[in-house]
């Protein structure tokens, strides 16, 4: 377990940002398909994917969206944040083996603890794969919480 301290609304500043990295693995794609029910063969079947414009299997777009959600919930503003909305543009496919940098930046502080965030994702080549914006309700007070350790989950 690890301790994480959120950043409450009053401490957020325009321009403040965080970058979280994650390598996309085979198991991520399989688990996301199993949990979401999105069994599109472009994600799961190499032979099928070879006949698409991508020429190979790709990760689910919303898997990348989930990484954005995790960065907001766990890093900026962090625990206690409530999602109000999200817009995503998928610029390029995410491939298995890609290392993604999820960048969350404070764009604007709005009334009633609402915050507008830039949500961008880049691959290991510096190519932007996702561009978006989120609106969240930031926590009112600073809290340090213990983040639970997650069990190892497998797909059989």
Regions found by a protein language model. Name each.
Residues 1-14, 94-156:
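HotDog/MaoC-like acyl-thioester-processing domains
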Residues 74-102:
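Mid-chain, well-packed structural core segment of small domains
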Residues 19-23, 89, 105, 135-137:
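Generic structural detector for well-ordered beta-strands
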Residues 2-81, 143-156:
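Hot-dog-fold acyl-thioester-processing enzymes
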């Amino acid at each position: 377990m690890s301790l994480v301290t959120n950043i409450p609304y009053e401490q957020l500043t325009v321009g403040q940002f965080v970058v979280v990295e994650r390598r996309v693995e085979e198991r991520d794609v399989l688990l996301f398909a199993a949990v979401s029910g999105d069994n599109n063969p472009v994600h799961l079947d190499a032979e099928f994917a070879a006949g698409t414009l991508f020429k190979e299997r790709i990760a689910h777009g919303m898997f990348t969206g989930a990484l954005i959600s995790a960065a907001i919930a766990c890093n900026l503003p962090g625990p206690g944040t409530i999602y109000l909305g999200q817009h995503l543009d998928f610029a390029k496919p995410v491939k298995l083996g890609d290392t993604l940098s999820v960048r969350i930046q404070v764009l604007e502080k709005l009334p009633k603890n609402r915050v507008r965030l830039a949500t961008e994702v880049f691959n290991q080549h510096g190519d932007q794969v996702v561009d978006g914006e989120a609106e969240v309700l930031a926590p009112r007070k600073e809290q340090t919480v213990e983040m639970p350790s997650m069990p190892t989950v497998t797909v059989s």
